[in-house]
Amino acid sequence: MDTVATNALTDALTDVAPGAAHPATAQDADALHLHTAMAEACQQACQAIAPAWPLDRAIAVNPHWARTGMPVRQVAARMAVLGGIQVFPARAQQLGAWQAGRITPADLDQALRQLPQAQAQGTTAQQCTEALQSGAPVAQLPLLIDVLDNDPRRHTRLSWRQAITHQVSQTCAAYFDEHQADWQPQRAQGLYAFWRDTLQHDHGIGLLMGLPDLGAAVGALPERAEDAERWVLQRLGLPQPVWADYLEAVLLTVNGWASWCAYLGWQAGLEGRTDPHLRELLAIRLAWGVLLLECKNDAASQQAFATLQRAWRGAPQTLQRAEDALLIDEVWQLALEIGYQRELVQRLAYPAHPGVPQHEIEVQAAFCIDVRSEPLRRALEAVWPGIQTLGFAGFFGLPVAYTPLATQARRPQLPGLLAPAIEVTDRVLSAAPTGVADDGALQGSASRARQGRLALTERWQSASRWPGAAFSFVEAAGVSYLGKLGQWMKPHTRARARDDLHGLPARYRAICRPQMAGLDLDAKVSLAARVLHAMGLNQHLAPLVLLVGHGSQSANNAHAAALDCGACCGQTGEVNARSLAHLLNDSAVRQGLRGQGLDIPDGTTFVACLHNTTTDEIEAFDLDLLPPAARERWDGLQPVLAHAGDQVRRERAPTLALDARTPHAALLEQLRRRANDGAQTRPEWGLAGNAAFLIAPRQRSRGVVLGGRSFLHDYDASQDADGSVLELLMTAPMVVTHWINWQYHASTCDPERLGSGNKVLHNVVGGTLGVFEGNGGDLRIGLSRQSLHDGQRWMHEPLRLTVVIDAPQAAIDAVIAKHAVVSQLVEGGWLHMWRFHESGFVRYAQGIWMPVLVTEF
């Protein structure tokens, strides 16, 4: 590489400042225009990447979220052409569904009728069935690293794509790590500068790949990421209209790390700032391509470079051909969904139980909308008609962040779409009335005890990481691990442990209670009123109201948070449920609510609970604070909870290769043992199978067997005159369920690129950043194969969410018209929008509500 020429080009591109208002000459004006166009292309490419949350806050995300402004088939074409990524289900999988009768001829015919493009092009059922015998004819556009991979030694080494991905990935792992390495890298100059410095001092890849001039070429790179971006785009010589597409394709080669950087940008946006890491990653990955071109500067590489330019000049036509070719895949996707909708319509058209009169309800239980709550809600109502269950987002409307006692481990407990506005901390409070001084003494002694234990643990762990301890520590302390080894060889059957109490002496655990801090009485009353109204609990309250969050139980599971509550940002719902119960049981808050016309009867008590979704047990908290009458009701409820839990465990047993006829105590023991087994890769199925979201009164689905595939959110349009609650539901929980649905969809349709691979091979990166499959490659995002496949068959069907709302048409239309994000999801085919209607159902199609009758299915 010619250093003088590179510097000259960099100078030419940076002579005109980005904010210059009056270029001095026409040449300056052209340079400014070029600079702006390049920056816009880079920004557009970066905006196409969806965020991926870290392991300890893992929530489901639609990996195509940043592209939902386009119709789903257009996105499918772009992902296939730019990244070799499959969006629709594989044709082989659809062929199996067709041959097994899962998709019927009637389903296929109806799909062809529902898709206007299929009607316009005259697509036939015969064309669709014949197409299943072959793959979609979609060609992926090459990148510079691909066309340069043409030397005679290419079969004896890693491909350039593999080698570069590995090098960039290892660099990112070192740079972003804040939890594993004791010696942290210098990050002050940014990711791009760190990579450039690393590559200059690491001669291994140059020797391994046969690039002796790599070090000199790296030294000649521009020092700033922005200059590197402009230098590469200028060197590539591609037409300006395809810049953003090429840059997006480049980012897709390191999609895992790009998604991590997008997460950093997302968090920065919530805090009102910007983050440069994704742009720097783009500059790194761009620079690598041109480094190869400069190092291989021969006739073959120049010919390959010309091939690249020809291919990308035809990129718009390639994308359009791909979109046309994928029409048949969209037809089959819809046909698969119609097959499910046929069953859903038949079940919802005739609810099994109309409900119980309000005066007969003795207990109300508010569950998360999670699909795993549906079987337990159904079982509870079947076991005892005196219980009414409700569905609400599992964070219970509390925009909180939680910091456990005597720690600085602050974490969000709300959906990833939102930023926390309220802090929750632990208070150590005994049930018996004590003075403020006594409570303060308890708080202080508990804090000191925990800090001492945590400090001792940290010293022990630090000692085990000393370089000199590699052998001596194992020999001296190895025997202490025999107990843990024994637990792994024979897992125990204890109930779920509460990680938030780690390091806290047992005498304080029962009285360590999370509570909201920093709110005056007016703020508490206002928050309580909003939550009660949104939950539909502003009237007709039962004597006992359970606030049931949920959490999972597993051992040795890097993705454990992904099985917890997504609405609580990958945490259990315990903190939110306990904080809200404390708020609503506060007599001063209740008095303030009466001033707003909200009367919580004196005989009503709220109890915080947690649904263990792995074992289907329900645990309650702060029972020592309950009044005698409420405690008596809770104790009387235990046989109902036990019977309902056993019923759900038997329903789930076959999917876990367990015998549903096993005696109830033995079956619970088996599930607990699985939950505590460090070798168990499938402790539960999470949200696999999710396919529908009902926003409606419980009477619409009470007694209906929905198979744990439906999100259920209670909503009463008669109590929402201004439509504000519906607007909230369609812009928050509906978006969250869409994210969940599409993460499962994407990880099933393309497990290699949008899934995290084989869980057995996972190695955690940076403590909480994510995982590698093996010891290298890109950071893996999405769900593992074991979360979706039981070894014989897929446990998740890749269906787009069918949202069924019981609300006036005008109210739904108003939300769609007001919120672009909702309009894009509905109009772009990212989900199905249905509405309950007197004669059955109607569905939203291109701005028109079309009748859906049971007879159609």
Label for each model-derived stretch:
Residues 428-456, 589-624, 734-782:
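Conserved catalytic alpha/beta cores of large enzymes that bind or transform nucleotide phosphates
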Residues 21-220, 259, 630-857:
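Long, compositionally biased intrinsically disordered regions
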Residues 371-373, 402, 551-553, 698-701, ...:
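Short, glycine-/Ser/Thr-/acidic-enriched flexible segments
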Residues 4-16:
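Compositionally biased, intrinsically disordered low-complexity segments enriched
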Residues 16-439, 443-446:
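Long, charge-dense tracts
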Residues 433-538:
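Active-site cores of enzymes that catalyze phosphoryl transfer or operate on phosphate-rich substrates
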